[in-house]
Amino acid sequence: MLEGIIRDSMTKQATKTLRREGYLIANIYGKGLENVAAAFKKNEFIKFLRNKETLAFDVKLGGNVLKVVVKEYQKCPLTSELLHVDLMVAQAGVRTSYSIPVKAVGTAKGLKNKGLLMVHTRRIPVKSTIENLPNEIVLDVTNLDTGDNILIRDIQFPANVDCYLDPRVPVVGVIKAK
């Protein structure tokens, strides 16, 4: 479980001080809940996110435990350092928008014919409850030849998970290398 602190002051100076001390600024929000300004140790947060197994994870703030999902993050354009993260509270039984990562598995046939595997869509936006949400969408690309694509309409989503992308959007494909 990831532990953080609730920020008391919202001034620019207080934010700079927290960042200098190694904290990551966060905003936690949810449907029907009051926004919470928080801060997490940056290194702990990054290590925790790399090792988590599900989209939703628990954070502890001032004695309260919240189940949250990373909704958005900001990086410094020069150093690519993580500056800010928005966390949304994942409430049971409430349909919300999430972005599910795509994972391509296998070696495509087209790669033997000097093709390149292109992942066009790294995350697929869906609407679902947190209970029905898959951790990732695994696509088997072994049968893809040069010029073949896997489209949104080719993916079998779990029950009660609705994708709101156009069905003709390519997710993974093999293109001919030049």
From Swiss-Prot:
Assigned keywords, A-Z: Ribonucleoprotein, Ribosomal protein, RNA-binding, rRNA-binding
Pfam families: Ribosomal_L25p, Ribosomal_TL5_C
InterPro entries: Rbsml_bL25/Gln-tRNA_synth_N, Ribosomal_bL25/Gln-tRNA_synth, Ribosomal_bL25_b-dom, Ribosomal_bL25_C, Ribosomal_bL25_long, Ribosomal_L25_dom, Ribosomal_uL5_bac-type
GO cellular component assignments: cytosolic large ribosomal subunit
GO molecular function term, any single one: 5S rRNA binding
One GO term of the biological process aspect: translation
UniProt-listed NCBIfam families: bL25_bact_ctc, PRK05618.1-4
Role: This is one of the proteins that binds to the 5S RNA in the ribosome where it forms part of the central protuberance.
Assembly and oligomerization: Part of the 50S ribosomal subunit; part of the 5S rRNA/L5/L18/L25 subcomplex. Contacts the 5S rRNA. Binds to the 5S rRNA independently of L5 and L18.
PANTHER family: RIBOSOMAL PROTEIN L25/GLN-TRNA SYNTHETASE, ANTI-CODON-BINDING DOMAIN-CONTAINING PROTEIN, RIBOSOMAL PROTEIN L25_GLN-TRNA SYNTHETASE, ANTI-CODON-BINDING DOMAIN-CONTAINING PROTEIN
Family note: Belongs to the bacterial ribosomal protein bL25 family. CTC subfamily.
Name the UniProt record assigns to this protein: Large ribosomal subunit protein bL25
Organism, as annotated: Aliarcobacter butzleri (strain RM4018) (Arcobacter butzleri)
Lineage of origin: Bacteria, Pseudomonadati, Campylobacterota, Epsilonproteobacteria, Campylobacterales
